[in-house]
């Protein structure tokens, strides 16, 4: 792939990411993390982390610090919350390009950065932004410097790699070091440079790594180690430092404190099939053909592939796992599969596979219009037919088929599907209609209200129904159960606003089908107590 065409595609995907950054935040995680970061700005407290009114001991501070700095510079809104994460995704794409150029060749390198930024899971990570966006970018960054050190043996590359690896650790803990370490071990084995591990410079790198963690260690010590009386997930006397270095990752492996999401040993393997779209199908076939022909001759690719399989297997052992946990492996996945994808460009099987992928995205593009704009589905279908005809007439490469499919689908997602879907987050609806200068709003549902907290830049006070019996001139947020109880105790309560609510991150077929959607919705209300 040529540099000029790569730039055009990157600009197209840059516009796509920008559109996603303008949308409201999704609950729970994105909105929750935005509230946690904005609280740092509002209270000018960058040391303590809180989830609502409770001390937060889960993911370390760096993601929240970056978001808070962005909000301090550009204001408290969804765009500024997403900005550091999206920028680091593009930084990650750049360092994937640099690493691929180091390991393979320039042609593969230009394509690799595009493969990374156009992967379906990375696009979603830039919109439904959690800690994984920052983590993935930093992991790609650290891998490049450490790979350069293995190839060139320059001390500055080792120290840069250790510093950035520390930042990755300060974002989500031990998993970052496991992934970075897996790549480093694979390259050490490929180049037979195991002696690098036993140099004095390795000790210096360890010191730099620990130095980069000092802000997080200090914050954890202040919030938790000095306050053993704090209770987190039912346990007191929690050490933040011990949690960071040991407990966090092993709690997820065992499911302790987080619950269990299933024992499917192939969870991340089948998650990969959609997460690495539009390149998963052609990548698997390409890697298979590489394996059949000269796999044993390509030592770097061989070792990276083994490292990827081992890391996937290790992550699959966890009792608590979610699809976006795969994101941290995307830099390595890109390094493994980009040469395999390019291998098919000049082969007969490559273009049919890319057209099949385009058709899959085309069908998905039509389907996401149906739930909210069924009349537009026909127009989208006709547009895709015309686009297919144009691509066929111009005899474009398989790469253009792949990138066109993912670009069209996600443009429709960010301009058609998600804007309507997010209307079913009642907090967003209420935030447009309430004026808290008139009176206080309290939460009687005992459910999180992250988007309202973010919009009004405060944690809504929680009140029980019994506490509200004698309250006056106050707004109360209720669901159907608390509404009925409140009306019995306060017949004078007046409905101020109502909105339909759905947990939009857990889509179901019943919700997506317009005729059955009403059965999946709950009604939430804002009540005025005179």
Regions found by a protein language model. Name each.
Residues 121-135:
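Short acidic/glycine- and proline-prone juxtamembrane loop motifs at membrane-interface regions
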Residues 95, 135-151, 333-336:
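Specific aromatic-rich, kink-prone transmembrane helix
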Residues 83-103, 141:
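Transmembrane-helix motifs of polytopic, lipid-linked glycan transferases
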Residues 176-298, 307-339, 353-372:
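Transmembrane-lumen/periplasm boundary regions of multi-pass, lipid-linked membrane glycan transferases
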Residues 3-9, 96-118:
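Transmembrane-helix signature of polytopic, membrane-embedded enzymes
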Residues 101-107, 142-160, 168, 341-345:
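Membrane-interface transmembrane helices that cradle and orient dolichyl/undecaprenyl
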Residues 14-16, 32-55, 62-65, 69, ...:
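Extracytosolic helix-loop segments that constitute the early lumenal/periplasmic catalytic or substrate-binding loops
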Residues 159, 253, 289-530:
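Membrane-embedded architecture of ER/inner-membrane glycosylation machinery
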């Amino acid at each position: 792939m040529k540099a000029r065409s790569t730039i055009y595609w990157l600009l197209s995907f840059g516009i796509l990411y920008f559109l996603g950054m303008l949308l409201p935040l999704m609950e729970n995680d994105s909105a929750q993390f935005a509230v946690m970061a904005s609280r740092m700005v509002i209270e000018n407290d960058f040391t303590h982390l809180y989830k609502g009114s409770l001390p937060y001991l889960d993911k370390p501070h760096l993601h929240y610090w970056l978001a808070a700095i962005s909000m301090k510079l550009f204001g408290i809104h969804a765009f500024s919350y997403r900005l550091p994460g999206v920028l680091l995704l593009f930084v990650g794409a750049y360092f994937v390009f640099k690493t691929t150029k180091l390991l393979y060749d320039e042609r593969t390198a230009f394509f690799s950065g595009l493969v990374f930024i156009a992967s379906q899971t990375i696009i979603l990570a830039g919109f439904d932004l959690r800690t994984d966006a920052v983590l993935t970018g930093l992991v790609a960054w650290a891998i490049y410097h450490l790979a350069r050190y293995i190839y060139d043996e320059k001390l500055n590359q080792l120290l840069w790699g250790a510093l950035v690896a520390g930042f990755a650790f300060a974002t989500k803990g031990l998993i970052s070091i496991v992934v970075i370490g897996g790549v480093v071990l694979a390259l050490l084995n490929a180049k037979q440079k195991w002696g690098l591990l036993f140099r004095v410079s390795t000790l210096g790198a360890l010191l730099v790594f620990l130095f980069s963690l000092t802000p997080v260690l200090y914050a954890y010590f202040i919030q938790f180690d000095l306050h053993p009386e704090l209770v987190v997930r039912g346990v007191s006397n929690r050490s933040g430092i011990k949690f960071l270095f040991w407990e966090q990752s092993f709690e997820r492996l065992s499911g302790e404190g987080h619950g269990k999401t299933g024992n499917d040993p192939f969870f991340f393997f089948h998650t990969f099939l959609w997460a690495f779209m539009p390149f998963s199908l052609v990548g698997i076939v390409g890697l298979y053909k590489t394996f059949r022909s000269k796999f044993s001759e390509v030592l770097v690719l061989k070792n990276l592939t083994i490292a990827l399989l081992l890391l996937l297997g290790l992550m699959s052992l966890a009792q608590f796992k979610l699809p976006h946990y795969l994101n941290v492996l995307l830099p390595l996945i890109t390094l493994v599969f980009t040469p395999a994808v390019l291998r098919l460009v000049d082969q007969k099987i490559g273009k049919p596979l890319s057209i099949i992928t385009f058709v899959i995205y085309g069908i998905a593009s039509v389907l996401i219009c149906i739930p909210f704009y069924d009349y537009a589905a026909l127009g989208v279908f006709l547009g895709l037919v015309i686009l297919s005809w144009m691509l066929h007439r111009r005899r474009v490469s398989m790469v253009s088929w792949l990138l066109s499919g993912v670009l069209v689908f996600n443009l429709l997602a960010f301009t058609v599907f998600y804007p309507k879907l997010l209307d079913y987050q009642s907090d967003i609806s209420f935030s447009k209609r309430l004026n808290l200068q008139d009176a206080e709003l309290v939460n009687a549902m005992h459910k999180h209200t992250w988007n309202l907290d973010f919009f009004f830049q405060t944690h809504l006070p929680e009140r029980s129904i019994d506490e509200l019996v004698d309250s006056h001139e106050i707004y109360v947020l209720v669901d159907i159960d608390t509404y009925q109880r409140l009306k019995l105790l306060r017949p004078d309560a007046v409905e101020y606003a109502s909105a339909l609510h759905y947990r939009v991150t857990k889509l179901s077929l019943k919700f997506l089908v317009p005729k059955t959607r009403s059965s999946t919705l709950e009604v939430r209300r804002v009540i005025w107590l005179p």
